Amino acid sequence: MSQTNLSRLYTIALIAVFIYGATPVFTKMATATADGITVGALRAIVAAPLALFIILVGRYRVPLRRDAIILVVISGMGGLVLFPVFFSWGVQHTTAGHAAAGTAFGAVMAGVLSALIDRRMPGWPWWIGIATGTLGALLLIWEAVGIEVEGVTWQGDALVFLGMFMGVVGYIAGARLTKQIGSTTVTMWSVLVAAATLLPLIIFYSGAETLTAIDRDGWGAILALGWGSTILAYLLWNRALADGGVGKIGALQLLQPVVGIALALMLLGERITLPLLIATLVILVGV
């Protein structure tokens, strides 16, 4: 691969990592004018028109088989209904920095859940990594419970972790179907499943009063979540993986919590504590 192509590859990957890393900050900005449940629901709904456009242009179809349809539904419900709703709800009650650190624990959850589903017993280095990552997550909860940090609650952190777990369930279901029909097809159809599921929530739970109370910055943050985190970052990241391979590109994901914590400091003025930094480092070491 030429130096020019390599630079282009890393640029695409880093843009995706930046958008993913900024997701907790976008979410925190959105929850300033709407509750977390509404923000999580709107994230999929505003992404739906773009997802539908991509499906129509690319002619992405899901096979009308029972197993394929079930996996798409699980992918959509886990990754694009339950994950954003619980995650956004959690961010409403904690800091973006804590949420950013919590996203790193998703890789640990994915490893454990995959091992359980596949009924395999990994070696001791894997268990050491899992234990280390779990220790980092417990450090985050410990800070929320035991140290007075403005904006941090253990309930918010717990909701973030619950959202990450639901997202991992959706990710694993989608990954199994990806081998058959491709990742873009799975993701775009999952967005439509999620939007159809969440639309009644917006109508009957949020209502017109909540939607009209969202200001311009709030809608900008929600659009960034829907179009950026859900669609654009996904397409860029998978393009980088396809061209460069997991071995060369995958490690860049470790920058996501770093980006999130840095943006929380710069854009939101959040206090970055020593326990938060230590917990993030410990989780990354475990990953």
State where each predicted segment sits.
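Glycine-/small-residue-enriched transmembrane alpha-helix faces in small-molecule transporters
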Residues: 1-41, 85, 149-176, 196-198
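Cytoplasmic-side transmembrane-helix entry/capping segments in multi-pass membrane proteins
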Residues: 13-14, 66-76, 122-134, 157, ...
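Membrane-interface helix-cap regions at the ends of transmembrane helices
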Residues: 18, 22-29, 33, 47-65, ...
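Specific transmembrane alpha-helical segments of multi-pass solute transporters/efflux pumps
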Residues: 19-24, 52-103, 139, 226-244
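Structural signature of hydrophobic alpha-helical transmembrane segments
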Residues: 32-49, 88-107, 153-165, 215-230
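Helix-helix packing/entry segments at the starts of transmembrane helices
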Residues: 40-42, 80, 84, 98-105, ...
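Transmembrane alpha-helical segments that form core, pore/gating elements
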Residues: 51, 110-112, 116, 130, ...
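Hydrophobic transmembrane alpha-helices of multi-pass small-molecule transport proteins
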Residues: 51, 73, 105, 122-144, ...
